[in-house]
Every structure is written in structure tokens, then in C-alpha cells.
Amino acid sequence: DLHVYLGCEFHANMEMLPMLREQKVMTMAGSRYVLTEFSHNSEESYIRERLGALLSGGYKPIMAHIERYEATRNSLDFVEELADMGVYMQINADSITGKDGFFTKRYCNKIMKDGLLHFVGSDCHNSAKRSCRIGEAYRMVSAKFGQDYADELFIHNPAEILK
């Protein structure tokens, strides 16, 4: 059987908590996990404050596609700080496979090597322009970092959202 669960990126803003409480936006599969997106040039202080607000509100923020933000690309210490706060990190499959460029792939490998990644997303919008390469990304992670780590990112951690 195939089960489909709703969820989408929620662009960070100053009204996040009221919007979540009033169910104007959805969480991942109706859970406390919130896939949170920022503008590519968001400041560290804004990211820290918004994710901290979600944590204080009892939510479990997943920072969507961390490979796209200047703040997280320029400072692995900042990524580690957020992870230590309780923020989960997500990158896109295309970034792992190299479709988004060599430097993005190298950054993703560093994040995985340092154990800072929790989820891999497909970022599939349609089958023509953004097709799903999640299987290819899984195979690459498994070959480079081991099947146990690949299973954690692609199977076990996502399953936790559904509990």
C-alpha cells in the first residue's frame, strides 16, 4: 500500500507561531515537525531567532535545503550551533548527486561527513524540470558513507516524523 502524507516548506516569517497554532499552514504529516525555509541571504541572527521560536513553541524545525543559504554555506559552526539547539538539517537529493554543481556537492559531503544531516528531500516539483533523483542520492550516500547512514537519512529519520 502507498500512503501519502501532506507537508510542505514553510517560509520563515514573524507570524510563524500564530499561523501554526491556527493551522493556517501545515506541518509535516500533521506532526510537530516543520520544514522551514529561509531566503538565501537571511542573516544568522534571523535564522537563529526564527528556529528558536519554533523550538520554544514545541515544534521540531527542519531547516530546508541548508546548502542554499549563505549563512549555512559560509559557516559549518553555525550549522553545528543550530543542530545543537535541536534543529534538524535537510538537503536536496540533486545537491548530493552533483546536479546543483561541484561546490554544492562538496559542501553536502562535508555536512554528511560531520554528521550534521538528518533528512534528504527530493525537491520534486514535476517530472519534467525537477524529476526525482532520491534513489540515485541514496545509492551515492550508501557508497560513500555506508548503508546504515543512508538508511538513517532516507528511511529511519523520515519514519520518525510519522510516529
Language-model features and meaning:
Residues 1-90:
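Extended substrate/RNA-proximal surfaces in nucleic-acid metabolism proteins
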Residues 11-13, 68-72, 96-99, 125-129:
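Active-site environment of divalent metal-dependent phosphoester hydrolases
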Residues 65, 123, 158:
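Conserved, mostly hydrophobic/aromatic
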Residues 88-91, 96-98:
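Aromatic-anchored helix/helix-loop segment that forms the rim or "lid"
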Residues 101-104, 146-147:
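Glycine-centered helix-coil hinge/cap
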Residues 107:
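Catalytic cores of alpha/beta
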Residues 116-132:
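Short acidic/histidine-rich active-site segments
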Residues 134, 138-163:
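Mid-to-C-terminal alpha-helical segments outside catalytic/metal-binding sites
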